[in-house]
């Protein structure tokens, strides 16, 4: 692309668009039957930090009949330059226009990237609306955590992959390949062919009806042979670690090597979508992790490695693993990161064991400011445990800690919000009696967003006015104590709640907001709530209907036809437990909670 060479010197971070990175895979286009572009709807340095996309990239490229290439959302200046030069959106590996691919697969991990999906399709010269595509257009598919409520994006995506993609994506590519050879063409026929694969959901094959109050009445298949429920795919064993990941030319958000030590979490925090949709827990062995570390560090040159999971300190042999790592890499100046830790002294001891030299900062998430509210969300930490944990961290040499809280959790009162301030003050008072100048405590607050497939999916989000009032309580209280507070813009949390719990009506609002200029909504400097407010008004949509309305346990939810494997009965039971402040124990270490997965997955631990 000669035109590309002409515009790259004029845009920010041109290395976002050059490709050719170490460990990138360039296959012979003509020697493969199926070509997929793996698309991430945000900039390069964020998408390159996504482990899931890296796993799929390498799995597909191991297949001799298929190739996978990468594409990310160009930044605003690059989009403008591409449109001016009539350069269509292209893949990094071959620089081919996306229109040349058989399939474009989007990873949807955050609702505020939805308008970027539309921008990427438009830049590629592909009709944004699935209803306007024909046989000459690539198949547009999407997966990721947001696909567990696919309805708001149903007008734009031909096919959703529900659940974990490692197996189902290869099945889909094989099925697509067979169709091309045996049938040839016919978009509807192709989709009907692919819809037979478990975990595949084609929104155009379902009729959604609504009640007079705009709630969903039903979602039913249009054709025989189409399943009434789309079931989440789960893999029994984690696929091998990617030990030759693509090495970016520029710094990325998580610029380090990564190994997923385990997948899934059963601690049962009632607000947590990931804790439901990534169940059950599946672990790698210590031997597998250590062997992969050797290869990964050798193939990348990184001197920092993250051991990733939803709760790293719950890995069954975490002490043995850390001991083995310390023994094996002693003196190698290797930094180990444990990004998801329980708030207890054991986690501090783990960090102490892997941290050599200067200690920087620890991060924990108490989530709520009172013991009562933590019981409601099933995060059963006492104030005493939190204070003792931070005191232990201070004694072990840490001078800085960041604490994450949510405001607007179900049943939260002003007293609970003030409890965040009191808890922070108690921490500071307890620690200031120790050495030196005390512990630097940073508080981060964000508004609770009710998510699909969680016990709190029926709960309404508090209003933006209430969010601002509660942030003000924190600002005033923490300022007096000399502690720093950061918070998420309430309007961003509000829009996230709208899109999280939306139905098909929202597709027209997403489309209209995009036409009005909405893009990079996840970026604070680009987020324009007024654009969205106008889109909702023009489309006669009340955002409060989705974000703030409390829903009946009997209501048909827009995502009810998506089966995560966790039963609605279990979610209702957990919702009722929250109102009673009743704890539900982690089924890995106690009795089975009969969430539904015990009937489906061999890795579930069943202790009845």
Regions found by a protein language model. Name each.
Residues 1-26, 30-32, 36-38, 480-608:
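Radical SAM enzyme core and accessory elements
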Residues 50, 251-287, 591-608:
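Canonical Radical SAM [4Fe-4S] cluster-binding loop centered on the CxxxCxxC motif
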Residues 38-39, 43, 112, 295-402, ...:
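Conserved SAM/AdoMet-binding glycine-rich loop
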Residues 73-221, 455-503, 511-524:
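Glycine-rich beta-alpha loop elements in corrinoid/cobalamin-binding modules
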Residues 76-77, 152, 207-211, 316-317, ...:
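Flexible glycine/acidic-rich beta-alpha junction loops that bind and position SAM and/or redox cofactors
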Residues 53, 85, 121, 155-160, ...:
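Short secondary-structure boundary/capping segments
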Residues 7-37, 44-45, 203, 209-258, ...:
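N-terminal [4Fe-4S]-dependent radical SAM core
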Residues 36-42, 60, 246-273, 297, ...:
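N-terminal pre-triad scaffold of radical SAM enzymes
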């Amino acid at each position: 692309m000669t035109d590309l060479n002409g515009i790259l010197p004029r845009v920010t971070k041109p290395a976002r668009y050059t490709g050719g990175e170490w460990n990138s895979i360039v296959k012979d286009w003509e020697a493969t039957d199926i070509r997929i572009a793996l698309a991430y709807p945000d900039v390069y340095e964020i998408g390159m930090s996504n482990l899931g996309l890296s796993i799929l990239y390498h799995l597909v490229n191991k297949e001799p009949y298929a190739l996978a290439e990468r594409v990310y959302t160009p930044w605003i200046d690059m989009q403008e330059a591409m449109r001016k030069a009539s350069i269509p959106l292209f893949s990094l590996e071959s620089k081919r226009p996306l229109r040349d691919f058989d399939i474009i697969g989007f990873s949807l991990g955050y609702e505020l990237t939805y308008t970027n999906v539309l921008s990427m399709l438009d830049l590629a010269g592909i009709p944004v609306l699935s209803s306007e595509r024909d046989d000459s257009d690539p198949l547009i598919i999407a997966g990721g955590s947001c696909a567990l409520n696919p309805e708001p994006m149903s007008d734009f995506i031909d096919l959703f992959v529900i659940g974990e993609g490692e197996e189902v994506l290869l099945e889909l590519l094989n099925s697509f390949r067979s169709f091309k050879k045996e049938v040839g063409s016919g978009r509807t026929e192709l989709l009907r062919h692919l819809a037979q694969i478990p975990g595949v959901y084609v929104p155009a094959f379902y009729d959604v009806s609504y009640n007079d109050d705009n709630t969903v009445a039903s979602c039913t298949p249009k054709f025989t042979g189409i399943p009434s429920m789309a079931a989440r795919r789960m893999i029994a064993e984690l696929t091998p670690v990617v030990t030759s990941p693509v090495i970016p030319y520029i710094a990325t958000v998580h610029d380090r090597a990564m190994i997923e030590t385990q997948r899934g979490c059963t601690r049962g925090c009632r607000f947590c979508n990931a804790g439901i949709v990534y169940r059950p827990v599946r672990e790698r062995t210590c031997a597998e992790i250590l062997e992969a570390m050797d290869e990964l560090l050798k193939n990348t040159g990184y001197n920092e490695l993250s051991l990733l999971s939803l709760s790293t300190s719950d890995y069954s042999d975490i002490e043995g693993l850390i001991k083995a790592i310390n023994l094996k890499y002693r003196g190698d100046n290797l930094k180990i990161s444990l990004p998801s830790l329980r708030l207890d002294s054991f986690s501090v001891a783990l960090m102490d064991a892997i941290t050599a030299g200067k200690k920087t900062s620890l991060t924990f998430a108490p989530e709520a400011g009172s013991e009562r509210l933590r019981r409601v969300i099933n995060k059963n930490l006492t104030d005493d445990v939190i204070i003792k944990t931070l005191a232990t961290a201070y004694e072990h040499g840490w001078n800085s800690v960041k604490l994450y809280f949510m405001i607007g959790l179900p049943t939260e009162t002003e007293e609970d919000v003030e409890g965040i301030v009191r808890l922070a003050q108690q921490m500071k008072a307890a620690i200031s009696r120790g050495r030196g100048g005390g512990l630097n405590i940073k508080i981060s607050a964000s508004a609770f967003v009710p998510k699909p497939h969680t016990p709190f999916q029926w709960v309404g989000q508090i209003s933006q006015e209430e969010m601002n009032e509660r942030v003000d309580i924190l600002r005033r209280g923490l300022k007096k104590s000399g502690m720093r507070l950061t918070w998420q813009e309430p309007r961003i949390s509000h829009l996230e709640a709208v899109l999280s719990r939306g139905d098909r009506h929202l597709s027209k609002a997403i489309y209209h907001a995009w036409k009005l200029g909405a893009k990079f909504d996840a970026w604070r400097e680009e987020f324009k709530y007024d654009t969205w407010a106008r889109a909702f008004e023009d489309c006669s949509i009340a955002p409060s209907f989705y974000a703030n309305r409390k829903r009946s346990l009997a209501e048909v939810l827009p995502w009810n036809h998506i089966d995560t494997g966790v039963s609605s009965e279990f979610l209702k039971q957990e919702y009722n437990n929250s109102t009673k402040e009743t704890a539900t124990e982690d089924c890995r270490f106690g009795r089975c909670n009969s969430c539904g997965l015990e009937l489906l997955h061999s890795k579930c631990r069943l202790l009845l």
